[in-house]
Amino acid sequence: MSQQPNLQALFERPTTLPDPDAQGRLARLVGMDDKIKRLANVLGVLINPAGLRKWQDKHHADAGTLLDAVIRRPPLVVLSGDVGSGKTELAETIGDKVARQEDIDITLLPLSLSSRGQGRVGEMTQLVSSAFEHAFHEANKFKSAKGAARGGVILLVDEADALAQSRESEQMHHEDRAGVNAFIRGIDRFANGGLPAVVLMCTNRLNALDPAVRRRAADILVFERPTAEQRHEVLSRRLGSAGFGKADLQALVTATGEQPTRAYGFTYSDITQ
């Protein structure tokens, strides 16, 4: 009889938010103000829709049907972009802003890469199911029959294309296909339970995700490489106090952008690491 995996095998560094470290990391993300605001608002509605209902009752009392359509979206958000585009850092820290915004505690559960398993029969399905079961149990503690949620859960899945890749691939192993099925069942269980929980996925291969997963996403945020203006902001924050003048910074902005021999500019991590 197979053993249930322990929490250390399922999650990497579970965190309770708000947290000063996460707040500081989020503040250091440059050029992402629009994405931070959009993601925080989407997660806030999915985790704690009571605030939106209160606003609707006050300003648009006859818009209940529209509000239900917004609130009933599956609790799944996908962040897609190149490696180093900042999506994982944002995913790991955005819960702090949501926690402060909604005035609740958020439990961040980063799904461990080891949860993919080693290919043994039934292993991946059991690991994914156990992760969702624990997240469901935690979120159920915060559920409120009436009024605002008492807390929330974010289940973070990095490198999601390795876990929820398309089942349409002819090369896909049966075990992987079963794992994707378990993943979709987990998302649907969150949605049907009306829990204060959301699945936040990061991928650099959006088209590799299973179509059923993409269809369930309440929102998909695409991360591009930083523009010249954004590169200048990053560089000036890092180097401005070190004596780099305007001409020096502009030269670095140009050097980190597209070149005749390179059809793409630097990512955020290329510049900062």
Would you name each region that the model predicts?
Residues D19-R28, V77, I220, E258-P260:
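Short hinge/gating elements
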